[in-house]
């Protein structure tokens, strides 16, 4: 089995308790790989009739499939270069469906590179509405632009700025926002040895500080009644529940609709955390405040 950081193992054991050994055993298994169909370019029925690869449906997304990279190489097929599908880690495909995207929505992907969430959002918008894909890293933004162009983006704007400047330009503008936050990358351990080497608990706390700033700015760009989905590919409570719980406590108009952890010993995927938050309108805020007063009396 791969060697994992001791502090990481201690923290996961506290979270999982009786499931800890099962989680550790999952690191003896191969990483999972997936592809997600671009339904703007090809229907699911037509794609499956091509029978190009040995595919298995991913249960949490209609457009996603598992594939075995030891048997097939979808990344080398011309359809990949044509933007008919996007290669994406399977558990990462659980995020965008939580947005409940409707045609015509104005959507923001705050931490967009390399484009997994943005390309998925585009296929859901189906050439309607607007997607703003933001990436603060000027190096990573090149890959984002290439992937969006390959996917056939026509209703998309790419921005390269921090969350504070973005918030000043788009206050209260978006129907839906996704924050796939920069994180310590613990969900990458099984597929990327460098992620293990780079991990420190200091990095966890550093990421937490950045995440808190991003979600605060993101929420201010959300319309009343809008949906914000926060996600990470890490397991630490500090970067997941702690960030969300503090944020909800600070914002009386924010309601946690659902949160979900995808663990590699429970699902076929590398692991993810997803939280769905709604911004209440003024009337709903008043109702919430009245209910809290009744509970406190």
What are these regions (language model features)?
Residues 1-297:
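S-adenosylmethionine
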């Amino acid at each position: 089995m791969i060697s994992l950081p001791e502090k990481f193992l201690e923290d996961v054991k506290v979270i999982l308790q009786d499931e800890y050994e099962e989680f550790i055993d999952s690191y003896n298994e191969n990483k999972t790989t997936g592809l997600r169909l671009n339904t703007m370019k090809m229907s699911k029925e037509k794609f499956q009739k091509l029978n190009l690869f040995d595919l298995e449906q991913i249960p949490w997304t209609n457009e996603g499939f598992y594939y075995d990279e030891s048997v097939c190489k979808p990344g080398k097929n011309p359809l990949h270069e044509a933007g008919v599908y996007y290669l994406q880690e399977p558990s990462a495909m659980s995020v965008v469906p939580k947005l409940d995207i409707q045609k015509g929505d104005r959507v923001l992907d705050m931490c967009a590179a390399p484009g997994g969430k943005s390309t998925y959002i585009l296929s859901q918008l189906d050439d309607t509405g607007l997607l703003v894909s933001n990436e603060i890293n000027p190096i990573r933004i090149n890959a984002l632009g290439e992937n969006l162009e390959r996917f056939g983006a026509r209703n998309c704007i790419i921005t390269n700025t921090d969350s504070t400047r973005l918030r000043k330009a788009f206050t209260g503008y978006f129907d839906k926002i996704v924050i796939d936050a920069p994180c310590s990358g613990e969900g990458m351990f099984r597929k990327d040895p460098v992620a293990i080497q780079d991990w420190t608990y200091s990095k966890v706390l550093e990421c937490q500080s950045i995440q808190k700033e991003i979600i605060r700015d993101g929420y201010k760009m959300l319309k009343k009644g809008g949906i914000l989905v926060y996600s990470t590919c890490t397991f630490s409570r500090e970067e997941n529940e702690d960030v969300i719980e503090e944020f909800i406590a600070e914002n009386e108009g924010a309601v946690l609709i659902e949160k979900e952890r995808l663990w590699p010993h429970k699902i076929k995927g590398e692991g993810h955390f997803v939280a769905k938050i709604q911004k209440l309108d003024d009337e709903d805020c008043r109702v919430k405040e009245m209910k809290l007063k009744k509970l406190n009396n």
